[in-house]
Amino acid sequence: MADSLIEHWPDELSGLFAFEVGFSGGLDSVALLSLLCEARARRPEIGLSAVHVHHGLSPNADAWAAHCQALCDSLRVPLRIERVHVRAGGGESVEAAAREARYQVYRRSASEVIALAHHQDDQAETILLQLLRGGGARALAAMPALRELAPGKLLWRPLLEIPRERLEAYVKARGFAWVDDESNLDTRYRRNLLRHDILPRLERALPHYRSHLARAAMLQADAAAILDEVAREDLQACRTENGLDCGSVLALSAPRRRQTLLAWLDALGWPAPEPGALLEFLRQAEYAERGASPVLRLRQGCLLRFADTLQAWPKAQSEPPASTALLWRGGDAQSLSEWGGELAWERRDAGVPAALLESGAYLAPRRGGEKLSARVGRREVKDLLREAGVPPLLRRRWPLLYGADGELLAVPGIAVSYRAAADGGWWPLWRPARP
């Protein structure tokens, strides 16, 4: 197997010499570490190390770490042991939280390449699990052999074409011991249910199921790559300064609309929503009445239709401050991170006089019942915001401009007090920050 590993060394790894093995001490990672030690013997330029992630979830965790240290010492491989605290929250499973903790450790590695020991059986299990979850082409492409883990760092899975039984024979032939995680026997976990109950029966009926599933994953990876390419082109064509042009998005076919929004979310670093929620948002965006603002709420923020654009707004980290003093600098914009935006200025025929802005003006949030002086009577601020098409989600963080005496001078970007306005004055413009 070491000969095959060296023969099929990926071109993408040329010129990279610092390799770190994710080392649990189980059969698979023992096999990978041994194989890379053999490769190191033939290619001395390879720098090899290992990392063991101590999750602290098993009473045997300390013993596993000690086993890993002993084996690495015998193979003359430097080992670092990283202890992590696994916290599952928001409906996340302990298994998923532990996986994320491991990958955080891998991302912090000083090595250029992180090598993991996933094999052909793991790949088959992953494909079936994704299928049972209703995954699309990207999910069914399963685990790639090589991908970027972090800037300047690659994740490599060199064993994906090798079944577990071959790895077991290899490890036994070399006399290595390995540890068994007792949680791998718990069939309450779906992967273990597949591994111990379902796949053995499938193998009896279809002995070559692993290679067939691997081929299916390869085809799905090709399909996913084409989808991504088209989605990136559509996304670029639909982009505007403020988000996506709604008309351009809705001119696409329904599948391309969905893929464009998924590509947009991916570019923002936001996870994909449930397919049904995305479909409903697009339906509402297409048929919403003028002035309506359909919203798709996500953990990181929300997507919404605002006038003729689709916009992404990050979730506010805190309530706006009770008040913020205006720092008047002769029309220079003022960045207001605590409000989530920037206050800019334009000279207009009927704007706020500079004298009022220089003498104690301040910003404050809506509290309800505010009214602004108009040509005839006074207008309620809530009506001005609604008529301007400001989505309800943004109204509570839309700052109002007051004079030192507490008089409402302006709703930035929307209206200026008729009573306070003067020729050659200044119009405040509110520019909410976007991700």
UniProtKB/Swiss-Prot annotation:
Subcellular location: Cytoplasm
Domain of life: Bacteria
Molecular-function GO term, any one: tRNA(Ile)-lysidine synthase activity
Enzyme class: ligase
Swiss-Prot/TrEMBL GO biological process terms: tRNA modification
SMART domains hit by this protein: TilS_C
UniProt-listed Enzyme Commission number(s): 6.3.4.19
Keyword vocabulary terms for this entry: ATP-binding, Cytoplasm, Ligase, Nucleotide-binding, tRNA processing
Keyword tRNA processing annotated: yes
Pfam families (alphabetical): ATP_bind_3, TilS, TilS_C
Binding site for ATP: 24-29
HAMAP family cross-referenced by the UniProt entry: tRNA_Ile_lys_synt
Function: Ligates lysine onto the cytidine present at position 34 of the AUA codon-specific tRNA(Ile) that contains the anticodon CAU, in an ATP-dependent manner. Cytidine is converted to lysidine, thus changing the amino acid specificity of the tRNA from methionine to isoleucine.
Protein name as catalogued: tRNA(Ile)-lysidine synthase
Lineage: Bacteria, Pseudomonadati, Pseudomonadota, Betaproteobacteria, Neisseriales
Gene from which this protein is expressed: tilS
